[in-house]
Amino acid sequence: MANYLVNNLSRPLKIPIRIKYCDSFFSKLIGLMGHSEISENEGIALAQKTEDRIGSSIHMLFMRFDILAIWLNSHFIVVDLKIAKRWNPFYIPCVPARYVLEVHTSQKPHFFIGDKLIFEDI
């Protein structure tokens, strides 16, 4: 898995979020399930081959903590975001998405629909 720093070009973050990029079936299925928590500036990005609603849905089964789910289109524009509660079965974005960022809930004030994000190599 590759690592990236994610920043918001529309509202730059003081500290970019360090993410692990998950594009295999297994890495996306497991996601953050085995973690007891994540720090405020860490998360994962789940990548799909194309934009769609069902393929970019997430489940929260076996999760020990809530997350902020941020759905992005192919141009890294935020198209939806929700606080995903642990143990809720699943969340589906309102519109098709290609990427899902799963980050700490404290990041919610820093992201809005329409924001443009950037993934920078570490």
What are these model-derived regions, one by one?
Residues M1-I122:
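Compact, glycine-rich, soluble single-domain proteins
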